[in-house]
């Protein structure tokens, strides 16, 4: 049984997907967003090591509250722990639970066959991806996160090709992302 590194769990999320959500914050993120509200999730291999059953114990004990919601994974970057995520979502999917990944898309590796096979397996048990596009401009994105947005935008296109439901999320920060030309460019993307 795989164990994941979990930062924390929120039992009543209302902004992390449809309905009331059980929100699991994964530990580890390669991005260094200047406005990150969870910088304590950045370091991998910290947090609490938990099995899928341990993570979901609180969800199943409160299941009546989630009938129009489900489970959302966020972070950190949940796709850093792909094997654990696949095991988690496979169990939830088998039980008919709505699954959602809140991701930056930074882990997308289209040239890595192993990653792509795991991603396709994960997408079979994923109902929704909330994709956080931090900045549409490549240079501004790098200044904001310390990473290019190339893989992130490629991930968005891949999800579109696979017909995976996606909600694009974008944090509007005056002086950083709140510029008409960038918002229009993001809208056209």
Give the location of each predicted region.
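Canonical Radical SAM [4Fe-4S] cluster-binding loop centered on the CxxxCxxC motif
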Residues: 2, 8-50
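Flexible, active-site-adjacent loop/turn segments at secondary-structure boundaries
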Residues: 7, 12-13, 39-40, 139-142, ...
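Conserved AdoMet/S-adenosylmethionine-binding subsite of the radical SAM
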Residues: 60-70, 79-189
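Short acidic donor-binding/metal-coordinating loop in glycosyltransferase active sites
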Residues: 75-76
């Amino acid at each position: 049984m795989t164990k994941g590194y979990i930062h924390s769990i929120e039992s009543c999320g209302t902004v992390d997907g449809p309905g009331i959500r059980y929100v699991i914050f994964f530990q580890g993120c390669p991005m260094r967003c200047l406005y990150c509200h969870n910088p304590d999730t950045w370091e991998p291999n910290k947090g609490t090591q938990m099995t899928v059953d341990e993570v979901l114990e609180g969800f199943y004990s409160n299941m009546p509250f989630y009938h129009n919601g489900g489970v959302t994974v966020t972070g950190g970057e949940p796709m850093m722990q792909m094997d654990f995520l696949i095991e988690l979502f496979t169990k939830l999917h088998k039980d008919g639970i709505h699954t959602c990944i809140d991701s930056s898309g930074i882990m997308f590796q289209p040239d890595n066959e192993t990653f792509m096979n795991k991603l396709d397996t994960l997408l079979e048990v994923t109902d929704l991806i909330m994709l956080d596009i931090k900045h549409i401009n490549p240079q501004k994105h790098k200044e904001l996160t310390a990473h290019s947005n190339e893989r992130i935008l490629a991930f968005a296109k891949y999800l579109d090709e696979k017909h995976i439901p996606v909600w694009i999320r974008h944090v509007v920060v005056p002086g950083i992302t709140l510029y008409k030309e960038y918002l229009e460019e993001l809208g056209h993307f």
